[in-house]
């Protein structure tokens, strides 16, 4: 059974903002390893459009930064599923469009052979958390305080107890916390 891993960066005060992160070589290498061990990425519309608007262009025109360019190739080649009620089509290669999150479909995806499944969209992390489908949370805490923004767990309705599996620290001051939900 494949694990469904919620992997996302957030500020120390709990907000998700792609501009509020340190994207140095060490962080990119970390995410390259994460993508190398994944077989599928799941996105919501907003995160999909953000990623799709940038990474394919890096594949075509590499930056010269080895970890960043490697990340671009990895994310370009991985299988992607986008959940959106408003998108009519998706143009990024290896991408399928689904209209809504259906628990049985996600469970079926987890049962398939292959590498782990990653989700990195705040709204989808909440939806999949509500459906009790997340096997592991990898929360990349950035050494930044925003004071406002999109809080990751704002719409989670029920308490979720987590067990700390490990931590990983980075030279820039970021820390990734690895958690798994404990049984209720």
Describe each region flagged by the PLM.
Residues 1-184:
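Enzymes that bind and transform nitrogen-containing heteroaromatic metabolites
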């Amino acid at each position: 059974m494949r694990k469904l891993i919620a992997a996302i960066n957030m500020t120390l005060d709990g907000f998700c903002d792609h501009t509020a992160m340190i994207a140095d070589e060490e962080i990119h290498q970390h995410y390259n390893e994460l993508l190398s061990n994944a077989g599928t990425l799941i996105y919501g519309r907003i995160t999909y459009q953000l990623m799709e608007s940038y990474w394919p262009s890096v594949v075509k025109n590499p930056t010269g930064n080895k970890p960043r360019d490697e990340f671009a190739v990895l994310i370009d080649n991985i299988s992607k599923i986008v959940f959106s009620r408003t998108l009519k089509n998706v143009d990024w290669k290896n991408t399928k469009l689904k209209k809504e999150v259906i628990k049985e479909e996600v469970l079926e995806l987890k049962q398939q052979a292959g590498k782990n499944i990653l989700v990195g969209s705040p709204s989808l992390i909440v939806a999949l958390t509500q459906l009790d489908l997340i096997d592991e949370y990898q929360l990349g805490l950035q050494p930044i305080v925003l004071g406002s923004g999109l809080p990751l767990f704002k719409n989670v309705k029920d308490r979720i107890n987590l067990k700390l599996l490990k931590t990983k620290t980075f030279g820039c001051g970021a820390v990734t916390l690895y958690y798994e939900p404990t049984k209720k």
